[in-house]
């Protein structure tokens, strides 16, 4: 009988067109009996998922929520964690390993406690640093930080129970290792599958670009509270005033849409918000552009993002303000320029004004993908490392 591996991911899914990390993990362990547990609610679309009829996937029903920062969302995550623990306790056949994506913290805590009691190998995969990553959003939420000490305790306890720590960046792994210093660990970036991205772009019905007289610039992903849209809008306003021929696309949807639309209309910018769309259309929209902006609020804890991954895979010139590993990649491979909240306007203008030179940098993404972001290679390496540590 094959070894059994259970993957737990509150947000992820498998067998979809999206580049979900859990799907890549699922494929990497193809030599084993694999099962996944996830929520039936889609965090991105704020709708319930179409449930697939697969014996390998178990969906846990959770309450819906519409705002990313809300009591309803916290309640939904708590319900998932409790139902997950009950599901684990009811398993007839136990897995040899449980691989749990973080966030959410309580989910990993219950998985860890179950694994310790049943002597099952426990792996945490840190995709975001909760609750710390939620507090830089505004002063109001930072004031709540002392009130969520139990949340921090649960997160750290989950780290300490892990037999192996995986993370989407070296920094995330190092944070967890402060609570579990002797645990084996590694980090694996989100990864890019060029062939799959090209297939999805070709499957889209979004029209091809026909106008090359303008520089097309984009921001892809959620219009949420974690991102620095003020700097983006000010930069677009500046290049507009300087006579740059451009079009700007917010290929996205989210809570900040109203404020962004108001600014665009007030200053009569050549910009638009596309709204939410299927992933293949999202990629096609991005692929038509020249420059992509990866802009988070200055106090963010994020090190590496899905949107950056998509930008690189589509060979866009990247303007980035994430520090650490993402900034290092931008510099090392010359795939774009780094900026901060004070100089985006200047840098965007410089890039647009000298676009005939800078557009050649787009091809540098290929080397970055080959050396650090090739999905097939990096996830296979991760799986082999974990299996060798556990002798599975």
Q: Model-derived features: where do they sit?
A:
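Membrane-proximal helix-turn-helix segments that form the acceptor-binding/catalytic region
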Residues: 89, 106-109, 113-117, 132, ...
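Donor nucleotide-sugar binding/catalytic pocket of nucleotide-sugar-dependent glycosyltransferases
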Residues: 38, 145-203, 271-273
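N-terminal subdomain of nucleotide-sugar transferases
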Residues: 1-61, 236-241
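Nucleotide-sugar-dependent
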Residues: 16, 227, 278-285, 290-312, ...
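Conserved donor-binding/catalytic core segment of Leloir-type glycosyltransferases
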Residues: 6, 208-227, 232-237, 249, ...
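A charged, aromatic-enriched C-terminal amphipathic alpha-helix characteristic of glycosyltransferases
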Residues: 342-343, 348, 353-388
């Amino acid at each position: 009988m094959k070894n059994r591996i259970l993957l737990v991911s509150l947000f992820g899914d498998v067998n979809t067109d999206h580049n979900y990390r859990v799907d890549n993990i699922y494929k990497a362990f193809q030599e084993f009996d694999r099962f996944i547990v996830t929520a039936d609610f889609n965090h991105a679309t704020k709708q319930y998922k179409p449930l697939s009829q697969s014996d390998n996937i178990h969906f846990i029903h959770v309450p819906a929520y519409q705002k990313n920062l809300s009591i309803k969302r916290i309640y939904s995550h708590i319900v998932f964690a409790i139902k997950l623990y009950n599901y684990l306790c009811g398993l007839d056949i136990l897995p040899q390993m449980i691989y749990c994506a973080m966030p959410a913290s309580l989910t990993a805590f219950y998985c860890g406690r179950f694994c310790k009691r049943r002597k099952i190998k426990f792996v945490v995969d840190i995709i975001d640093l909760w609750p710390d990553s939620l507090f830089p959003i505004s002063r109001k939420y930072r004031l709540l930080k002392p009130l969520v000490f139990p949340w921090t305790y649960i997160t750290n306890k989950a780290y300490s129970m892990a037999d192996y720590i995986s993370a989407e960046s070296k920094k995330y792994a190092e944070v967890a290792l402060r609570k579990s210093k002797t645990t084996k660990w590694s980090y694996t970036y989100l990864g890019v599958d060029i062939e799959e991205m090209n297939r999805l772009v070709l499957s889209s019905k979004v029209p091809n670009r026909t106008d090359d007289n303008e520089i097309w610039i984009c921001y892809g992903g959620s219009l949420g509270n974690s991102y620095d849209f003020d700097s983006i809008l000010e930069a677009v306003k500046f290049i507009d005033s300087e006579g740059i021929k451009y079009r700007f696309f917010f290929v996205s949807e989210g809570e900040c849409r109203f404020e962004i639309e108001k600014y665009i209309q007030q200053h009569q910018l050549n910009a638009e918000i596309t709204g939410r769309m299927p992933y293949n259309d999202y990629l096609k929209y991005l692929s038509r552009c020249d420059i992509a902006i990866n802009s988070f609020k200055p106090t963010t804890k994020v090190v590496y993002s899905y949107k950056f991954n998509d930008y690189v895979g589509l060979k866009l010139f990247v303007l980035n303000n994430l520090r650490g590993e993402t900034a290092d990649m931008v510099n090392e491979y010359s795939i774009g320029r780094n900026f901060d909240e004070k100089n985006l306007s200047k840098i965007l203008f410089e890039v647009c004004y000298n676009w005939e030179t800078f557009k050649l940098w787009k091809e540098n993404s290929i080397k970055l993908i080959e050396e650090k972001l090739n999905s097939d290679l990096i996830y296979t390496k991760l799986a082999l490392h974990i299996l060798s540590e556990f002798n599975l």
